[in-house]
Amino acid sequence: MNQNQDKGQGLLGRKVGMMRIFTDDGDSIPVTVLDVSNNRVTQIKTSEVDGYSAVQVAFGSRRASRVNKASAGHFAKAGVEAGTVLKEFRVAATAASELKVGDVIAASLFEVGQKVDVQGVTIGKGYAGVIKRYNFGSGRATHGNSRSHNVPGSIGMAQDPGRVFPGKRMTGHLGDVTRTTQNLEIARIDADRQLLLVKGAVPGAKNGQVIVSPAVKVKAKKGA
C-alpha cells in the first residue's frame, strides 16, 4: 500500500449503478460501480504557504462559459479542464511532493481488497410522515379510530414542561443529506475504464457524485 493511501489521499467519482460479479467459487457479490476517471490535480498545498499539506483534485467536466471568473482563473492556472467539483485531501508533505499540478490520479491509487469509505448525498424523498421517516407503527384501522391511522401520537405533555423537546421525531424532509458508508471492500478494479467495483451499496442515486477515501476505522483481522 503506497504512502498516499496511508495519509488519506482519495478520489472523486460518479456512481454508475449496481451489478453483481461472481467469484471463482461461483458466489454472487453485489457491487456498486464507481467511475473515478480523470481526477486531476488543481493545487498542491504546503505547510510553508498554506499551513498544512493537501492535494486539491477536480472531477467532472464543465463548459468554460458555465464557470465563474474566480474558478475559471483557478482552473486556467492549473492548466486543467474545468470541473464540476473540487475536493481537498489532507496528505503528508512527502506524498504531496510526489505530485504536481495537472497530474491525473488513477484508480490504481487503491488496491483490490482494500477497505474504503464512500461519501455521497442520499436520495431525496421529499416531505415524509413518521411511518416512512422513522419506521413508526400505524394506529388501529378500526375500533373507533376514524382519522388517526398515521398520526405520530402525543408530541409533548401539559403545562409542565409546556413545550416540545428538541429532537422530537416528527414529520419532515427525508433524504438529500450527506452520508458516509464505512469499511466497504473494493472487489475489483477496471484500470482501462477507471472503475472501482465496491462491495455493497453506497449513498446516492445513479450519476451522483461520491468521495472515495481510505477507511478510517479499519478493523484488525482476527489472528493477525
From Swiss-Prot:
Coiled coil: none annotated. The keyword Ribonucleoprotein applies. GO terms for molecular function: rRNA binding; structural constituent of ribosome. One of its GO terms (biological process) is translation. Pfam families: Ribosomal_L3. Keywords: Methylation, Ribonucleoprotein, Ribosomal protein, RNA-binding, rRNA-binding. GO terms for cellular component: cytosolic large ribosomal subunit. Methylated by PrmB. It comes from the Bacteria. The modification N5-methylglutamine is found at residue 159. InterPro entries: Ribosomal_uL3, Ribosomal_uL3_bac/org-type, Ribosomal_uL3_CS, Transl_B-barrel_sf. Part of the 50S ribosomal subunit. Forms a cluster with proteins L14 and L19. One of the primary rRNA binding proteins, it binds directly near the 3'-end of the 23S rRNA, where it nucleates assembly of the 50S subunit. Belongs to the universal ribosomal protein uL3 family. PANTHER family: 50S RIBOSOMAL PROTEIN L3 (PTHR11229), LARGE RIBOSOMAL SUBUNIT PROTEIN UL3C (PTHR11229:SF16). This is Large ribosomal subunit protein uL3.
